[in-house]
Amino acid sequence: MPSRGTRPEDSSVLIPTDNSTPHKEDLSSKIKEQKIVVDELSNLKKNRKVYRQQQNSNIFFLADRTEMLSESKNILDELKKEYQEIENLDKTKIKK
């Protein structure tokens, strides 16, 4: 998947002065990705197997579907909470 970041050779690209904007966009894409994961896991049939990838490796281990679903929902909630905090900070900066 191609990255959405700018390359050093792109000198004509305008860089926003607000540091939270790139983080906010990154969070937004992670939230979309996590929503898809939750949706896919929740729509699986009961007899389907789910595998978890070992971090920094190409090894996959069998995982419990319900545990993976609840873990994915928790991650989604945390991402949404962090995104909301950034939104609130942006709103307070605008008011000042």
UniProtKB/Swiss-Prot annotation:
GO terms for cellular component: cytoplasm; RPAP3/R2TP/prefoldin-like complex. Residues 23-96 form a coiled coil. The keyword Coiled coil applies. It comes from the Eukaryota. Residues 1-10 have a biased composition (Basic and acidic residues). Keywords: Coiled coil, Cytoplasm. GO terms for biological process: protein stabilization. InterPro entries: ASNSD1-SEP, Prefoldin. Component of the PAQosome complex which is responsible for the biogenesis of several protein complexes and which consists of R2TP complex members RUVBL1, RUVBL2, RPAP3 and PIH1D1, URI complex members PFDN2, PFDN6, PDRG1, UXT and URI1 as well as ASDURF, POLR2E and DNAAF10/WDR92. This is ASNSD1 upstream open reading frame protein. It comes from Homo sapiens (Human). The lineage of its organism: Eukaryota, Metazoa, Chordata, Craniata, Vertebrata. The gene is ASDURF.
